[in-house]
């Protein structure tokens, strides 16, 4: 039985907690503001995040079923930080992520990280030694319901773009970060055959051959792999993508926006397989890893370089974004 979602938090309370010292940057589009907050310094903002997350995830077919989507990872001394986009004209949250730096990951008695994804994925020794110290885990990405329909809200089209601005700034602020680790989510309401085509396509073009991270209970496709192989016959990513887009549209669906966004971010993205998140509406979570210095140039310029132009003092000599900057200077 789903609980009734809490009422909106008073906007004056939210504004009182969104102080200048917590502001990360302005967005490239729409003149929105990006903040980093925690449960300790912004308890009312966190409640509003939990409310908006639960609304957005329920609408898509997931969610916790609780009055707000907050868990143990949102609280405590080693909690995830919350990155949010704030619309200063409407005084409301547009969307957000939560994140935790690899250097702050705690390990359990088996040597596995205590993360929001730990119940679904096993991390190899190689990942823990060679990747974890330079990785930031991203999770619970959401766009508030009011900003998901571009037909009714002209700023909706920039909601995801605004979130990427925040992630771009993180690579500059945290010099050790070289990788984004996170999940792509597919919901049970999405047609099975379309889901299978998307996951097959992703595995074909982005599969991790090193088994750096593996799902504990890998999701099995309903569609025979031979049928899918007969559909995706191209070696080229773009050619196969055109096939995917066409076939999914035939089913009356679109490729989910976040899946599209991740695929278009880096040609060397690593895919770690898919597991079912039984505590979150049985959504299907696909683990991914993106190397920051291999993000496509258009995305780098928009989301990383734009922050450095505004805040050159933030770029540290060891920053994971340095490879991006100096690579472009050499061209």
Residue ranges and their predicted role:
Residues 307-331:
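Short, cationic low-complexity segments
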Residues 2-40:
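Conserved N-terminal entry element of GNAT/NAT acetyltransferase domains
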Residues 270-308:
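C-terminal/domain-terminus segments
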């Amino acid at each position: 039985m789903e609980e009734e979602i809490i009422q909106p938090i008073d906007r004056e309370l939210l504004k009182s907690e969104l102080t200048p010292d917590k502001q990360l940057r302005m967005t490239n589009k729409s003149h929105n503001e990006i903040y980093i907050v925690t449960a300790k310094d912004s308890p009312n903002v966190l409640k509003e995040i939990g409310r908006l997350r639960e609304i957005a995830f329920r609408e898509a077919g997931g969610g916790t079923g609780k009055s707000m989507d907050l868990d143990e990872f949102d609280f405590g001394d080693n909690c995830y930080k919350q990155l949010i986009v704030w619309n200063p004209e409407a005084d409301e949250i547009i969307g957000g992520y939560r994140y935790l730096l690899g250097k702050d990951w705690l390990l359990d008695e088996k040597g596995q990280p205590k993360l929001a994804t730990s119940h679904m994925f096993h991390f190899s020794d190689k990942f823990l030694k060679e990747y974890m110290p330079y990785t930031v885990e991203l999770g619970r990405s959401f766009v508030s319901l009011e900003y998901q329909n571009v037909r009714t809200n002209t700023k909706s089209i920039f909601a995801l773009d605004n979130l990427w601005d925040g992630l771009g700034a993180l690579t500059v602020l945290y010099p050790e970060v070289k990788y984004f680790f996170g999940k792509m989510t597919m919901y049970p309401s999405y047609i099975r055959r379309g889901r299978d085509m998307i996951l097959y396509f992703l595995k074909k073009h982005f599969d991790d051959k090193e088994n750096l991270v593996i799902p504990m209970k890998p999701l099995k496709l309903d569609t025979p792999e031979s049928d899918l192989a007969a559909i995706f016959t191209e070696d080229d990513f773009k050619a196969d993508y055109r096939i995917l887009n066409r076939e999914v549209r035939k089913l009356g669906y679109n490729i989910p926006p976040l899946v599209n966004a991740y695929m278009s971010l880096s040609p060397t993205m690593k895919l770690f397989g898919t597991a079912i998140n039984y505590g979150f509406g049985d959504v299907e979570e696909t683990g991914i890893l993106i190397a920051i210095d291999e993000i496509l140039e258009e995305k780098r310029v928009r989301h990383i370089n734009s922050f450095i132009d505004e805040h050159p003092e933030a770029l540290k000599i060891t920053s994971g974004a340095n490879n991006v900057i100096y690579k472009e200077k050499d061209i």
